[in-house]
Amino acid sequence: MAQESTRKVLALARKLGVIRPRDLRAAGLRREYVQRLLARGEIERIGRGLYAAPATKVSAHRSLAEVSKAAPQGVVCLLSALRYHGLTTQHPSEVWLALPSKAWRPRRTPFPVRVVYLSAGAHRAGIETQTIDGVTVRIYSPAKTVADCFKFRNKIGIDVAVEALRDYLKKHRGGVDALWRYAKICRVQRVMQPYLEAAA
């Protein structure tokens, strides 16, 4: 019985990429089986309450997967989203996460997190889902990310926002309509317009 349960835990870790205690509860498995697998080296603790099979192929964006698992309400944004989409030369030391304005900040995350709060409409707009290391990660689209960079230019720097805009226009020719739509949602049309005209 115990051996069968530990096999199920390992299978769940391989299927989901990263597992949490709530994933075990949902599958009807006890946490003690994780401890047995940890002791045998068949599973590894990658963060507080986060476990993965050691044979799991790890991507360069594993931090996004682990933080998304720890904070499912959050959306990867700003510098982290720019890095994911290849729109910056920046290497953020924190995972940037957008939360709705009334949401609680995640208390326990496996990596340092920088939180920004958005209105409900701005938070919902432009979300894409990507699978990273077997985990579904909510991340803003490239156009929404660029608009957010102008909205939070005082936090990340106007130079980063302008670099992101230029890189976006090079990679996404004809993507100005989407960019302008998100600029309206984020209320940064006036701020962004001169940079958009200069880059065109």
Q: Where are the model-predicted features located?
A:
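Nucleic-acid-binding surface
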Residues: 3-27, 33, 38, 46, ...
